[in-house]
Amino acid sequence: MQEDIPNILYVSREEDGRIVEMIVTEKHKEKYVYYPYSNKSTFTIEDTKLFNIANFSLIIQWITYTLFYSQAVIIFILYCWALNPYRSPGNSVLGGLGQRVPRTVVHINPHNIFEGCDKSIICKLRLPMPIINTTHGKIYPNFTKTGGSSANYKLALERLVGLMNNQQCNVEIISQKKTVFSSQNVTFFENVKSDAILALLVLQKNCHPESVEIVKSKIKLENYGVNYRQHMPQYFTVCNASWADVINNTNYNFKTSDRPCNTNYLLRYPQHVPYIINVK
């Protein structure tokens, strides 16, 4: 008997998942063949989809975690480095208490700022400070007076500036060449007065490194728009004021960073005194 060779007309899937084939035999008879439902391949596809979704979710989580972690690290670095007010940036010098000073103002080694005047360079102003020749004796920039005993040069500067502010007083300036200048020579007189005010400014600021470095180059004051005279007390001394209290005052206690300051290094003058100021 010859076996029927099926001729498949169509294949469909029922709602219950069964596969139905409609075939036509050699004898032209229609025949339906039902294949039972099998979810093996379906599960395999669904498992693959779930696996891909899980992997994608893990990738997103890892990227998010990495971004947040990197952001936290960057913020921490910024806080400890770039945004730290106590750190010295590349264009500044750091003081002992965290003050930032532009390098255009300060050019000294920051490690030497608070070493004390006996060892550090910050107190060597190199200002041409005069000998103040009073009616009771001479007061020198190294905080000594006639006879070599201690003297309060800061107090003498205050009194001197007060006299120079009083246009009625007779103040003579004797240069190295024995040339005598008075307040009538406005240019030279104002230069001497300016040096005295600058030195007094440093003494009043207790040798603060910023004030010292600014004073070392007066042009920097102009560049920064600083009028130091506006920040100084307006001393005014009567012409006949006695210098006895000044010449006898030795109470000058200067300290930098809680270290005693050797006043010999504070205001220095060369072997040839630049000028002597006579007050009468």
UniProtKB/Swiss-Prot annotation:
Domain of life per record: Viruses
Family recorded in the similarity comment: Belongs to the herpesviridae BDLF2 family.
Designated name of the protein: Uncharacterized gene 27 protein
